[in-house]
Amino acid sequence: MITPAVTTGLAESGIRISASPADYRPHFSHTGDRIWPETNCYLDLWIETLHALGLDPVPALACALSADHDGLQWTFLKQEPEDLRRLYGLEVSEEAVWLPLLETVESGPVRGILHTVEVDSWWLPDTAGTAYHADHVKTTIVPVRVDRSIRLMWYLHNAGMYELAGDDFDGVFGLV
């Protein structure tokens, strides 16, 4: 398992996402008729996180105007924490992770925060056909619901909300 290098807290009084994978509808920028591939998990994750919170993610896409190219490589496109604070009142900060990952993520709802967490996509069912049980690739998710007792997690990743359970739950949290 790839250990979480970054765990980010998104704090706003009692921040919660109430959708489930069964009823979640992705933001229109992630519909099947889009003309670009999902290649920036960070940008895609913020689009869906803001959308799931009932916020319009389009203003946050202004960060695309700051993309730069040095003649060989493009800069990595991402929303800046200050922009998210100004646009939506969301506080984005990195936490010093000292508890096991599962305990850290479980503590979020009690503290009124969501976490972005870097995990190994080997354990993410939504990556079937690419990395799921095939390749160890770092990616970022936002756990929305975690239930240790039934080994279940709902999470935002790329262009939607998904569910993992059982052995995948154990694997993503390093319980195996």
Predicted features along the sequence, with ranges:
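Residue-level marker of positions within ordered structural domains that often coincide
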Residues: 54, 122, 148-149
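Structural motif
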Residues: 116-118
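Cysteine-nucleophile protease catalytic domains, especially the papain-like/related folds used
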Residues: 2-103
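Divalent-cation
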Residues: 93-106, 111, 122-134
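Noncatalytic regulatory segments and standalone regulatory/sensor domains
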Residues: 147-176
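Glycine-rich loops and low-complexity Gly/Arg-rich segments
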Residues: 120, 140-144, 167-170
